[in-house]
Every structure is written in structure tokens, then in C-alpha cells.
Amino acid sequence: SVISDKVALQKSSNVYMFKTALKVAGITYGQQSINGVTAADFQKMRNGYARFGLGVETGIDLPGEFTGVKGNETLPGKYLDLAIGQYDTYTPLQLAQYVSTVANGGDRIAPHILKEIHEPSENGKTLGRLDKEIEPTILNHTNNTQAEYNQDHKGMSMVYNTPSGTASKFFSDAKYKAAGKTGTAEVIYYGPKKEKYGTYSIT
């Protein structure tokens, strides 16, 4: 059946995301073989994700930031995995930056450890004089329209606040309104015993 972009978010439709990714690659589902996917198509998807902070440095004011792991195969099936977040890996901070970029209408803002620096308190009860205030740093603005973001906001709200939403059962009794997107974390399991290469169980 045909579903809208909002319902695709609400129900976490992999098929919708697959078809969208194939359109990005110039392939019409059902009429062409997906073997036409190229390495350039993978990069095009990653370039789009990077505008939201996925797979790149978030700009946090700490050294040695890890940017996740990019898959090195370019098989068509891996391209579809990439479309639903099941190929490249991302850090929790990257995921937070991506969601905040969607939430605020396209500004990707660098996260900071500090908001303000104050002088020592003179009375032990109130903050001392403000010495420095950390201003938000906008790293880039995505090229999506506000109308597109409005659709995203509605769809992500439906995930949490409608009976068919994939997160609704966890937030049905919440005293606040939430929005977002659910996902399935992958687990790598090598078995309960020590392997011949000296590795233990990894989850």
C-alpha cells in the first residue's frame, strides 16, 4: 500500500527508506536491477547524512573524537542497509546532533561541555561574576525547506504520540510530549567461548 513520509517515520518503514534510497541512485524499484548501485551512490548518501552530523566530527570541544565506522563494501544490499542505518555505525553524540538538527529546522550546532564560566562565589550561595559565556556555533545549515522539516516534525511526533507509533508504548503515560525516531541496534555475538584468536564474547 502507499504510505506518506509521516507514516513511514511513525511505523519505521524499511521499505519506504529502501525506495527513497533507490531514487537517490536513480533506480526505479521493480523496473531496474539494484545492481546498478555504484560507489558514488554510497558517497551521495553519506554526504547527505554528514550535513546532519552522521559519520563526521560533531565539533565538540574535546580532543580525539571518534566518528564511527564506515563500511568498505559497495554491494547493492549494503546500500539498502545504509538507507536504514544498519551499515555504517554512528556515535550517540552524532545521533543526538542529527536529531537536534532536524528539531531546530536545519542548523547543525556544535555541542559544548560548558555553557558559562564564572568567578568563584563570594558568599558560597550564588554564582560569581560571569567570566565567559559559550556562544552556540552553527557548523552548517542543511538545504532542506521548512515545509520538509514540518513533515519530519509531524512524523517524529507520531512515533511517540499515536497508538501506531513504534515508541508509543514507552511514552503513553509520559507527562510531556516527546518526538523522535526509533531504531534497532545491531548485536555482534561470537559465542560464549574464547576463540582461537584470543577474543571473548562481544555484544
Model-based region annotation:
Residues 1-203:
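Beta-lactam-recognizing serine transpeptidase/beta-lactamase-like catalytic domain environment
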